[in-house]
From Swiss-Prot:
GO molecular function (one): neuropeptide hormone activity
Database matches in InterPro entries: Mcrtin_ACTH_cent, PMOC, POMC-derived_peptides
Family note: Belongs to the POMC family.
GO BP terms: neuropeptide signaling pathway
Residue list for modification Methionine amide: 13
Entry function: Precursor protein for pituitary hormones that regulate stress and environmental adaptation.
Name recorded for this polypeptide: Pro-opiomelanocortin
Coiled-coil region: none
Subcellular location: Secreted
A Pfam cross-reference name: ACTH_domain
Length: 39
């Protein structure tokens, strides 16, 4: 799960990491489980 998310959002979010605030309703749940340890 983590490796897949990291590969998908690792590139676009690695630099921006801002879109998470644009639509937290959709990423909040995934961000906490998948990107939780990264953030």
């Amino acid at each position: 799960s983590y490796s897949m998310e990291h590969f998908r959002w690792g590139k676009p979010m690695g630099r921006k990491r801002r879109p998470i605030k644009v639509y937290p309703n959709s990423f909040e749940d995934e961000s906490v489980e998948n990107m939780g340890p990264e953030l």
